[in-house]
Amino acid sequence: MADITLDEAKKEASLLRNQLDKWADAYYSKDAPEVEDNVYDQKYSRLLELEKQFPEIVTPDSITQRVGGEIDSDFTKVEHAIPMLSMGDVFSKDELKDFDQRMQKLVGHPVEYNVELKIDGLSLSLEYENGKLMRASTRGNGYVGEDVTANARYIADIPQTLPEPLTIEVRGECYMGKEAFAKLNEERENEGLSVFANPRNAAAGSLRQLDPKVTKKRQLSTFIYTWVNPPEDITSQHEAIKRMQELGFHTNETGQKLASLEEIFAFIDEYTARRDSLAYGIDGIVLKIDDLNIERSLGNTVKVPRWEIAYKFPPEEQETIVRDIVWTVGRTGVVTPTAVMDPVQLAGTTVARASLHNPDYLNEKDVRLGDTVKLHKAGDIIPEISEVVLSKRPVDSVPYVIPENCPSCGHKLVHLQDEVALRCINPSCPAQVEEGITHFASRPAMNIAGLGPKIVKQLIANDLVHNVADLYHLSAEDLAQLDHFKEKSINNLLTAIDNSKKNSVELLITGLGIDHVGAKAARLIAQKFKNLAKIMSLGVQDLASIDTIGMTIAESMTTYFAQPEAQEMIADLEKSGLNMEYLGEDEPEDIPDNPFKDKTVVLTGKLEHYTRSEFTKRLQALGAKVTGSVSKKTNYVIYGQDAGSKYNKAEQLGIPLLTEEEAIAQIK
């Protein structure tokens, strides 16, 4: 550390504490991190250096003296009988070697480690009494967490009852897999909601929901890795993990008992290379002394256990050059900048574009054409510019000028109150019309097969459609004007458009593209009020009275339906013969242990109690996806009499088989 005076150290430490407190609060309490982990870690390490050199500047409230963030939420507070401490971090193999030497010196001999993957999620404690799950809680500040028991009951791999009547506490990590994360963000995009930046944020936001039904839909998972105060006959970490597996807990099977640094470094190298191919996010490797008696003798500091350490992966970054900044117009008029760059390989994929989100973000980063930038993937998934390499900025560089006019229609762009986004508010903007019609025809909405973005673009270019109602006035002669459209393509598209008239009204509401109103909100509203005429007559309070709808959606819907243009278009749709009624089933009674929620199910054989169509609808109402073929992704096969090849294939693949009666018994 460079020479620094006591006064300078005090001043710098104070600034660092304030900044770190702000970042920690955003990360732990709001699930909305403001900086990447490596930036936080660098600042935290600097504060530790200062406090080590000048012990007199350490304050009791310094973030180095506590765990996590302060608790500020609507959840019941839970005091941890044994603190849930965080881990010390190292960022190089040399530091890991120093840790090993320190352990050997403290213990007096070489030690064996249980080496595990560091899962990128949030810490979770599970407490059982007489084998029954009684409480689940988050880490919080390490001493006081939040009671999330109601939500934890909807995480599929958390056992609600143990095979033995034990009173125990186990701890682990709650996470969201990459596939579930991608699915959730796709759903949120379709519903006009902001997407999560990474799986860790998504997991934290999903577990800390006031409505457990939201958690239930989010497909969270756990890895359990700690047994708090295990029985005396369990003397090591790996024995504890094996026993927890036997009790039904989901543990990570990649962990290994290793004795030498060479083996540990090989493990690190292996998973540094494999991390992109894993189904879940990891941000490092954890070393724990395997012998529990040694762990107990070493104990903890005020903040971290002495006997374990986390090796953090360095962020994978690539440098590339910004060649252009393009602006795209979404269906709601939001205009978004995207950096177009020289292609680079990053975390297993080729990346040539990264969102710049909004004008404030672009200006804050000060990204310019010709800049060399550092690119990484937030949460190993979303390409993001981390910084501009100023030393490589061209000498003739000039600040980027935010456009004043819409790139599609030339209309003046505006900032609406309380929004950082730029918007085009021209309802006839070709880009918005194109996006709106494409959305209307998409699978979550009216599901008009064959009507994709390229066809929509041609329809607009040929002046055949100006809004979604015009789709229902198209003729074979109109479609014959499109490129590569022959008789078969024309007939198929006209049939698909005609079939969409029969859709239940919630699909029409989804397709209208009303701000903040996605498929879920549309279904809830249609279930409640049954037809579009009734819905259009409602006030804000009527709509907001529906559980999970809220004022934002209610105000957006009433504003939309108050527009004369919207009323005219809906009247045109009704005149064209579109169904305006809710045709679905009422929301079924919630079944706490519903085994078919978010599962893929196949029906085979002759059923006795239901027709195939009736049972399919029943399963879909319970949240199942019913498909016609058996694959490795199938979760259950329900069979009746004379079951054939599907039954045999399920047996070969080891997929659970249920008789019709067994399936019915589980959903009564």
Swiss-Prot record:
The keyword ATP-binding does not apply. GO terms for molecular function: DNA ligase (NAD+) activity; metal ion binding. GO terms for cellular component: cytosol. Its cofactor is Mg(2+); Mn(2+). Residues 591-668 form the BRCT domain. DNA ligase that catalyzes the formation of phosphodiester linkages between 5'-phosphoryl and 3'-hydroxyl groups in double-stranded DNA using NAD as a coenzyme and as the energy source for the reaction. It is essential for DNA replication and repair of damaged DNA. This is DNA ligase.
